[in-house]
Each structure stands twice: as structure tokens, then as C-alpha cells.
Design a protein with these regions (language model features):
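Hydrophobic alpha-helical bundle cores within soluble ligand-binding/oligomerization subdomains
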Residues: 1-164
Length: 164
């Protein structure tokens, strides 16, 4: 994380790579991993409408769980526990969790009377930047907001799960 901070770049993707593979990526590996994450930031057709918007939940964890369970029905290899397939599923979930979280939040706030806006993720953005872009009505965010969120994502990834 210190290297990313010093160099003014985002560190979450590098940390995710480290946690999946047990070592830091070199520049080419990181770029390839970032491209994989961008590639998998796509939900099945009508998923947002049929799964997320039709039954909004005040509990984002409930919304995430329901979405992940439904995504399994779109995965022809969901029961394949080979290492390459499980790795693909991990990368795909890392890519999709931000979208599922933001879209779940947007669905709930819409149900509560706010305007609804659903933006598509942008492949050139980091995970932190995409979260902020998806979350805001005008997709705007500042450099510092994105970096603070990236640090938060990195710390949560490095320090375990649970409700922390």
C-alpha cells in the first residue's frame, strides 16, 4: 500500500492480486489483472432489473447475498471446483461486488423515494473510482475521495472479512 500511495496510484487491485496469488504482481501482471477485472464488470442482461430492482433490501449484505446466489444460475461452471475455475469466479466476484453493492443501494434509495440512476462501470477506472462513479448522480468524484476509498478497500481486503 505504501508504494501505491507514494506513486499516487490505486492499490486495491494490487492487494487483491497479492491475496489471490500470494505475491505482488509486476507491472505487466497488474495491468493484465486490471484488464480481467474490467472484463468481468458486466452483469447478465436484465440482471439489475430482474434481481436487484424488483426486490430492494434495506440490508446491503442481504442484497449482495441474493445477487451472488442468483449469479450462480448464470455460471455454466458454478460447480467446477478446479483451481482455474475457482480463480475465475474469485476475480469475477471481486469485479462485481462493487456494482452489486452500489446497485443494491440505489434500488433501496429509489424505493425510499429518491431518484434512480444506474450508471455502467467504466473499464479505465479503478475499483474505487468505479464505486464513486456508479454512486453519484453525475458520476463525479475527486482525486482524494477515490484515493481514500481505495485505502479503505485495501485495508478491508488485507485485514479480513466479517462486519468490520
Amino acid at each position: 500500500m505504501e508504494g501505491a500511495l507514494k506513486e499516487g496510484r490505486f492499490g486495491f487491485e494490487e492487494t487483491a492480486y497479492l491475496l489471490l496469488l500470494g505475491r505482488l504482481p509486476n507491472a505487466a501482471e497488474l495491468e493484465s489483472f486490471q484488464k480481467q477485472l474490467a472484463y468481468y464488470r458486466t452483469l447478465p442482461n436484465n440482471f439489475v432489473r430482474d434481481i436487484i430492482l424488483k426486490a430492494p433490501s434495506h440490508d446491503i449484505m442481504n442484497s449482495l447475498a441474493r445477487s451472488v446466489l442468483n449469479l450462480a444460475s448464470y455460471d455454466d461452471q458454478c460447480d467446477d471446483i478446479s483451481l482455474p475455475n475457482v480463480m475465475r469466479q474469485c476475480v469475477q466476484l471481486i469485479s462485481l461486488f462493487p456494482m452489486l453493492s452500489v446497485y443494491g443501494y440505489q434500488a433501496y434509495t429509489y424505493k425510499s423515494g429518491s431518484s434512480l440512476y444506474i450508471h455502467a462501470p467504466r473499464p479505465e477506472l479503478s475499483t474505487a473510482e468505479n464505486i464513486l462513479s456508479l454512486l453519484r448522480p453525475d458520476s463525479s468524484y475527486s482525486f482524494w475521495e477515490a484515493h481514500v476509498l481505495d485505502i479503505c478497500l485495501t485495508l478491508h481486503a488485507e485485514h479480513g472479512g466479517g462486519n468490520n
